Regions:
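Family-specific signature for flavin-dependent thymidylate synthase
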Residues: 1-211
Length: 211
């Protein structure tokens, strides 16, 4: 998993403060905007935060990408397994963490699997991944279309996507997906996004008490 900045609105916070003062044109050029943005966050004036945008590149798995793509206020561009060979992103499919199913919460897992059980299944999973990649490449080598061959690949197959959204969308996404109830791997992505958000929107981050 990795997350990195691709682009952000120049002077993003200054831009949001400028449009927030649309009804006070004599004060629009005021360079002091920390209190203004803090006030807007505190009192849920979220439309202001729809005026600046950020695009991040996210390296993850097909399984987690499906969760991310459910956030429909963003726009996306994802690596196409129909157009390109999946091995362009990775020659092998990386191992993932194994956790026990929480019997009281179907959307939660607990990290207390017996090490010997974990080792047993990791061996089987690695074999399964290797066989899947061999089968996939064999299908491509035999002239079978990528759009057909991709269906034999596991959800753990690496993917890359670009995620673009307003400051408001990023605040909502990070707040939701860094909280309890989110799958650990998705939470790790949200935390990485949060780190970049704090760097690019420091005034907002402070008002949100993220720093």
């Amino acid at each position: 998993m990795s997350v990195k900045l691709v682009s952000v609105t120049p002077d993003a916070e200054k831009m949001m403060a400028y449009v927030a003062r649309v009804s006070n044109p004599n004060n629009q050029e005021n360079p002091n905007y920390a209190k203004l943005l803090g006030y807007c966050i505190k009192h849920n004036h979220w439309s202001v935060f729809e005026q600046s945008f950020m695009t991040l590149e996210i390296e993850t798995t097909r399984g987690l990408a499906a969760q991310i793509l459910r956030h429909r206020s963003f726009t996306y561009q994802e690596f196409s397994q129909r157009y390109a060979d999946s091995s362009m992103l990775a020659d092998t499919i990386p191992m993932f963490d194994l956790r026990r199913q929480d019997t009281k919460n179907r959307q939660n897992s607990i990290d207390d699997i017996d090490p010997f059980v974990k080792q047993e299944f990791e061996i089987k999973i690695r074999r399964h991944f290797d066989e899947a990649m061999v089968l996939y490449q064999s299908m491509l080598d035999s002239g079978i279309a990528k759009e057909c061959s991709r269906f034999v690949l596991p959800l753990a197959t690496p993917t890359r996507l670009y995620m673009s959204g307003s400051c408001r969308s990023w605040i909502h996404y990070i707040t939701l997906r860094s909280a309890n109830g989110t799958q650990k791997e998705h939470m790790d992505i949200a935390e990485a996004c949060k780190k970049i958000f704090v760097e690019q929107f420091p005034t907002c981050a402070e008002a949100l008490e993220w720093v």
